[in-house]
Amino acid sequence: MTYLTGIASAIGISHFSLCQSSDASTRSPRVVFSGIQPTGIPHLGNYLGALSNWVKLQKSSAPEDELLFSIVGWHALTLPQDPAALLAARRDMLAVILAIGIDPNRSIVFHQDHNPNHTELCWILNCITPMGKLRRMTTWKSRLAASRNAGSESEVDESLLNAGLFTYPVLQAADVLAYRATHVPVGEDQQQHLELTRDLADIFNRTFKAPSPMFPLPLYVSTKCAQAPSKRILSLKDPTSKMSKSSPDIQSRILLTDTAAHIKAKIRAAVTDSIQGITYDPVSRPGTSNLLTILAACSDSDVTEVARLYENKGHGHLKSDVADAVEELLKGPRAEFERIRHETQYLADVAARGAERARLRSEETLGEVRKRIGLA
């Protein structure tokens, strides 16, 4: 979970940019929540699309705004996990968050699974969530499609899929509503889940009215500032698909831990085309356009302006510059990550402090929820 303006509008989610200037004296403090799964070292797409935006939010937020960034271990369990690998991945993801610049003194940084209030609220929300809404969730439908493609039967066998995957969006809603978050940065694939979160907040508010609405309807966050907004980074080997940690081809993605030599080799082998000159055309030239997108994102530049600089150059020149730009972007966070990941006591202390702050914050919400539903 990494919690496009056009898409948000199309499905009815209000959006807001925390980078917009505003008079803090004329508005209420904002509560921003976002989470990321601890499944492997983040790749360039994660960094440019979600993690770097967390840093922008931290820098641009007002002093009275609350920021919560969570490693959502319970969500990872919807798919089979090796326990030892998951334990290491949780610790590494915390190190990554700190390495990129999230300050645990300014923001609440914590492991979701260290705060049982999430699962308690998830159960309560499950009891007011219509089955029909969950069946329309794209996560569930995509797993059904995968099941159908894997087997020879024409009918999908839902018994092969776990209930956690089916109710995953409700846990995501609980993650957000436990802190009465007002703003949620989400990725393109999670926008439908944010709409469900707003629906469940509204259902609870209407069902348990007194004395006033319990939950705000969280807004989709756009981090578009004066700089160019982050673009979706695609696979280096299949530029029709997004860069993904789950791809079996390690050459398809650039990891935060990749050395300069690894980065150069992966960019050099990236799929492009045989057309002379460089132009930005995502439909006809997805590979070339993906490299231009990466280069523009690394420098917070407009991709069409970047493309004009290369219109009379070749792919070799472009790939060399992209590799240099990516290395320049990642070398600082990479070095900091390698330093922090071995400081196990420091990481444990940060996690413990973050969990305590998160529990105190969410207990206020759960206490009121229990009272309203009759369980106080």
Role assignments for model-derived ranges:
Residues 1-29:
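N-terminal mitochondrial targeting presequence
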Residues 18-33, 38-174, 328, 338:
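N-terminal Rossmann-like or analogous alpha/beta NTP/dinucleotide-binding catalytic cores
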Residues 36-38, 73-75, 183, 247, ...:
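Short, histidine-centered active-site or binding-site loop motifs used for metal coordination
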Residues 40, 78-81, 181, 275, ...:
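Short amphipathic alpha-helical interaction patches enriched in hydrophobic/aromatic residues
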Residues 41, 49-52, 114, 130, ...:
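Short capping/connector residues at structural and topological boundaries
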Residues 42-51, 68, 72-73, 83-89, ...:
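Structured ligand/cofactor/substrate-binding pocket environments in proteins
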Residues 44, 198-376:
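Conserved nucleotide- and phosphate/pyrophosphate-binding catalytic cores
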Residues 129-136, 178-185, 296-306, 334:
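Short helix-capping/linker segments at secondary-structure and domain boundaries
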